[in-house]
Each structure stands twice: as C-alpha cells, then as structure tokens.
Amino acid sequence: MARQEAGQGSPSGGQPTLWAISDLHTGHTGNKPVAESLHPSSPDDWLIVAGDVAERTDEIRWTLDLLRRRFAKVIWVPGNHELWTTSRDPMQIFGRARYDYLVNMCDEMGVVTPEHPFPLWTERGGPATIVPMFLLYDYTFLPQGAMSKAEGLAIARQRNVVATDEFLLSPEPYHTREAWCRDRLASTRARLEQLDWMTPTVLVNHFPMVREPCDALFYPEFSLWCGTIKTADWHTRYNAVCSVYGHLHIPRTTWYDDVRFEEVSVGYPREWRRRKPYSWLRQVLPDPRYAPGYLNDFGGHFVITPEMRAQAAQFRERLRQRQSR
C-alpha cells in the first residue's frame, strides 16, 4: 500500500496537527500495511489512537511503538479488543490486570493513556485539553422493545447478535462489565470536574459518548455493547470542541449540540476495501472546516456509489424481514 502522508486532502500545510485514528486491527491480514503507511505531516504532529489497535499484546505493542516513533505524541485509549484474552495471546492476563499491563506497556513507550495527566494541545486550534478515557459500556443503549439489560440481551440472542465480548472480555475483579463501567465513569468524572472549564476539551473514548451514532448500525441490537447513557451530556458539560471515538466501524463526521463528533475507525479489510476513505488519518485540530460536498450524505469521508446504495437497501430489507419474524 502506498505511503499515507497525514494531511492528504486536508489543509494542514506541514504545520502541527492533531490527528486521530482507531480500529486498526493490525492482527487482521491487510491491516498491518495500513498502520505502516501512517506518517505525520510535521515533526510536531500528535496522534490519537482511539482503541482496537489489535487483540494480542505483542501486536498492540508493535503498532503503538511504530506510531510513537513517528509522531511527537501518541495518545491511546483501549477498545474492547485490547481487553480480550484469547488463547493465542502470549500474556494470559484478564480484566483490570490486563488493562493495567497495557497501561504500563504504554508508559514504557512514552504513550499517553487514560491514567496519565491529560496533555494540553497548544498548537493550531488550541489550547485544548486532550482527555483520553476508558469507560467501557453498561448495556444501557437498549435495542427497541427492551426495558432492561436482560430484555436487551434476550432480543439480541434471538436475532443472533451477541458480541464476542461476552466470551473474551473478562471484567475481573468486578462481577460484571457494567460494574467496571460504573467505576470508570466515577473516576473519570472526578478528573473532568477538576479541569479549567474555560479551556476547551477533546474527549477521546473508544465508544461513542452519545447514543445517536448507533442509529446507523445495520444490526441495532449491537448497541448494547456500544456505550452508556451516563455520558450523554459530557460533550456540552465539559466544553468539548470535538469528541473522538471508533468501535462502530462507521467512519464519519457528525454534529450533536453543535459539537463535532469524529468516528475515526479503519475497520476490517472487507469493510474498508468497499469504502476506502480519502485519508486514513482524521484531522481533529485545528477544526478541518470541511468544504461543501466533502462529506457524503451520512457524514462519511468517501464517495457513495450507486452500487453501495443498492446493496444497503437490499441489506436493510433483509434486516427488516428478519426482525419482523
């Protein structure tokens, strides 16, 4: 794959820029060259890596080390895939111990994590406090027809939509993933409350901070594993100029309450080969101020072909029929 210079199709002009990317999934054949193609546009560029780098700890280390040697600062938050413990992983550690191991690994490489002091971006588009967060999810993004986690999971199982997290993402020492989420919410909120409210923030979380992006999911039941309603007002409460996330594999730009939300995922080869973006890296700061027509009808950074529209319509019809049974 050709070298991907940061800023292609954007007005960075070789000046310091804050970029973001997520869901590199470098353990998948075809995605490692994507990571290898990423380069800054200036020596002072920063890069946000919003989770799902890989699943094996050695592959996570390889990817973050590669990026840290190229960018002036790398800021990482975990996705659900980093927290999986698979039989192929050289480190058989689980739950919070696994997260702590990854934080220590990043610390050794000079990569910023949710456990470090929040870095302050003072270049173009700043000042802005970059807030990397690890919040997980609590099953409150319920699918239609559900009033509780149990009902939501029952609907999801009936429709054969069950996240692999249920088998590979251990919450230990917590009893449940939602208990871990509650703890992370409390500790993160306490740190956010200490920020200077006059300084804008860039909120970074693997999962979307609001429910609305999940409306674009082909399988709406998957929303159960996509976030928490407890963060619905954080982008306004904590003075965000941008909220960066991934997870959904629906890369696009949207606005909620006049705050820009950037879903910056690469996704799996079978996905991005159909709708390869103009640039792998997404500009966060300064505000890219997209030109009219740059974003497609859904906020995506790629051209929608007639074939794509036809395939999407066919898929949604099959989905409607499945849900009506």
Question: What positions do the PLM features span?
Answer:
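Binuclear metal-dependent phosphoesterase catalytic core
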Residues: 2, 109, 215, 221-239, ...
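N-terminal active-site segment of His-dependent metallophosphoesterases
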Residues: 1-76, 82-87, 174
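Active-site neighborhood of phospho(di)ester-bond hydrolases with catalytic His/Asp-centered motifs
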Residues: 20-22, 47-52, 75-80, 113-117, ...
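Short, solvent-exposed loop/turn segments at secondary-structure junctions
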Residues: 25-26, 54, 81-83, 120-121, ...
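Active-site-proximal loop/helix segment associated with metal-binding centers of metalloenzymes
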Residues: 129-202, 209-218, 313, 317-323
